[in-house]
From Swiss-Prot:
Belongs to the aldehyde dehydrogenase family. A motif (Microbody targeting signal) lies at residues 501-503. Keywords: Metal-binding, NAD, Oxidoreductase, Peroxisome, Sodium. GO terms for molecular function: 3-aminopropanal dehydrogenase (NAD+) activity; 4-trimethylammoniobutyraldehyde dehydrogenase activity; aldehyde dehydrogenase (NAD+) activity; aminobutyraldehyde dehydrogenase (NAD+) activity; betaine-aldehyde dehydrogenase (NAD+) activity; gamma-guanidinobutyraldehyde dehydrogenase (NAD+) activity; sodium ion binding. GO terms for biological process: cellular detoxification of aldehyde; glycine betaine biosynthetic process from choline; response to abscisic acid; response to water deprivation. Pathway: Amine and polyamine biosynthesis; betaine biosynthesis via choline pathway; betaine from betaine aldehyde: step 1/1. Disruption phenotype: No visible phenotype under normal growth conditions. Mutant seedlings exhibit increased sensitivity to salt stress. This is Aminoaldehyde dehydrogenase ALDH10A9, peroxisomal. Dehydrogenase that catalyzes the oxidation of several aminoaldehydes. Metabolizes and detoxifies aldehyde products of polyamine degradation to non-toxic amino acids. Catalyzes the oxidation of 4-aminobutanal and 3-aminopropanal to 4-aminobutanoate and beta-alanine, respectively. Production of 4-aminobutinoate by ALDH10A9 may confer tolerance to salt stress. Catalyzes the oxidation of 3-aminopropanal to beta-alanine. Catalyzes the oxidation of 4-(trimethylamino)butanal and 4-guanidinobutanal to 4-trimethylammoniobutanoate and 4-guanidinobutanoate, respectively. The gene is ALDH10A9.
Length: 503
């Protein structure tokens, strides 16, 4: 399938702008390992221009053009963007699939979610107008008070490659709804659809500088964005190591951050489940998006009474997954995003075997695919809690397995992690599911499923999985500053100080 990759520049101040140093980066199709295009590579010089453009857009006309415009005004732009995404859905899905390797069906689903996210935050932007000047109940009748919610300012956004456009929009849509202006730095491994978002913003007439998009390396564009003194907040999705570095940079300026970082999430399967249904949700929880999901439920805890039957079916189902070029009909597992990621996944599985674990299937290149960064999904059993594959995030199609005998043991094993992003519990006993949901040390819990995500529900983790919440009303609050206004309404003087004697 011939797909034309548009040649774009950086998007700064509403204009396509060549990088100051004229650097570029190759775009590699992970299914073929071929270079299919180039993206501009921003550096600190371009970050300066983008921050200046965002700052001007925020303050233009005393903020009346954007930051202090009504939510209804901003909502019109968000809805126009959503309509354009649907209009260009096929093109955007093709670019997403060829850029990051996810199956085309998944990429198309992502585009629906992108449009839905813009629509959702358009509604919330309109609702924000009615929430201004919310009255406060004060204990003294000589005062009245109210609350103002104001955009936090210029926001820097650094986003990952597993959901290149969708996870960018999780940040862009609520920030624009709130009245912020933004600089988006997508991952250098998958930036094509984010550049097309810039083109859509240009088409709908989004005011110049409201959204600026810089592609490039994290060290050359992301780091100077995170440490820039005129960026009011940083939001980041990615590795815990990078998130820690961003926190360090922000701390020097007392700059707020929201971080959605790594995960090693558990899925607990009790012995009263429908095994076929549970097997499919277990697979979906770990192998969806080619296994490259921050919330992947990649630690399977299965009750010992059903473990043999469950694993037998799980291996058979997993071997039946269609692994192919993302554009082949019925593809359910494409390549991982890059050579580095491919080598990382293979090494994790190899190390597990060397540590004494049993590889039930996968963890190697499929025999029928001689090129591309393809990995057969791996299922690894006989793991111990000290093994690397149990404790560290693989970010690829690799599932490790342990058995348990009691509910308490399952919960203890589930929470035995430095991460706390998500967890899943599968059981027909809903009271037990409720107990386990409360016991999980995680920000997201799935009951009798794994991975469904809706823009109406909050998203984020605990422990080393980060802090702050995206999506839902919480996602909008992420970009708002709360101001309290208190007014003295009595006709009488305050009377605290004795007035000077009259002469």
């Amino acid at each position: 399938m011939a797909i034309t990759v548009p040649r774009r520049q950086l998007f700064i101040g509403g204009q396509w702008t060549e990088p100051v140093l004229r650097k570029t980066l190759p775009v590699v199709n992970p299914a073929t390992e071929d270079i299919i295009g180039y993206i501009p590579a921003a550096t600190s010089e371009d970050v300066e221009l983008a921050v200046e453009a965002a700052r001007k857009a925020f303050t233009r006309n005393n903020g009346k053009d954007w930051a202090r415009a009504t939510g209804a005004v901003r909502a019109k732009y968000l809805r126009a963007i959503a309509a354009k995404v649907i209009e260009r859905k096929s093109e955007l899905a093709n670019l997403e699939a060829i850029d990051c390797g996810k199956p085309l069906d998944e990429a198309a689903w992502d585009m629906d979610d992108v449009a839905g996210c813009f629509e959702y935050y358009a509604d919330l932007a309109e609702g924000l107008d009615a929430k201004q000047k919310t009255p406060l109940s004060l204990p003294m009748d000589t005062f009245k008070g109210y609350i103002l919610k104001e955009p936090i300012g210029v926001v820097g956004m650094i986003t990952p490659w597993n959901y290149p456009l969708l996870m960018a929009v999780w940040k862009v849509a609520p920030s624009l709804a709130a009245g912020c202006t933004a600089i988006l730095k997508p991952s250098e491994l998958a930036s094509l659809t984010c550049l097309e978002l810039a083109d859509i913003c240009r088409e709908v007439g989004l005011p110049p500088g409201v959204l600026n998009i810089l592609t490039g390396l994290g060290t050359e564009a992301g780091a100077p964005l995170a440490s820039h003194p005129h960026v009011d907040k940083i939001v980041f999705t990615g590795s815990t190591t990078t998130g820690s570095s961003i926190m360090t940079s922000a701390a020097k300026l007392v700059k707020p951050v929201s971080l959605e970082l790594g995960g090693k999430s558990p899925i607990i399967v009790f012995d009263d489940v429908d095994i076929d249904k549970a097997v499919e949700w277990t697979m979906f929880g770990c192998f969806w998006t080619n296994g490259q999901i921050c919330s992947a439920t990649s630690r399977l805890l299965v009750h010992e009474r059903i473990a043999d039957e469950f694993l037998d079916k799980l291996v058979k189902w997993t071997k039946n997954i269609k692994i192919s070029d993302p554009f082949e009909e019925g593809c359910r597992l494409g390549p991982v995003v890059s050579k580095g990621q491919y080598e990382r996944v293979l090494k994790f599985v190899s190390n597990a075997r060397n540590e004494g674990a049993t590889v039930l299937c996968g963890g190697v290149r499929p025999e029928h695919l001689k090129k591309g960064y393809f990995v057969e999904p791996a299922i690894v059993s006989n793991v111990t809690t000290s093994m690397e594959i149990w404790r560290e995030e693989v970010f690829g199609p690799a599932l490790c397995v342990k058995t348990f005998s009691t509910e308490d043991e399952a919960i203890q094993l589930a929470n035995d992690s430095q991460y706390g992003l998500a967890g899943a519990v599968l059981s027909n006993d809903l009271e037990r599911c409720d107990r386990v949901s409360k016991a999980f040390q995680a920000g997201i819990v799935w009951v009798n499923c794994s991975q469904p995500c809706f823009c109406q529900a909050p998203w984020g983790g605990t422990k080393r999985s980060g802090f702050g919440r995206e999506l839902g009303e919480w996602g909008l609050e992420n970009y708002l500053s709360v101001k309290q206004v208190t007014q003295y309404i009595s006709d009488e003087p305050w009377g605290w100080y004795k007035p000077p004697s009259k002469l």
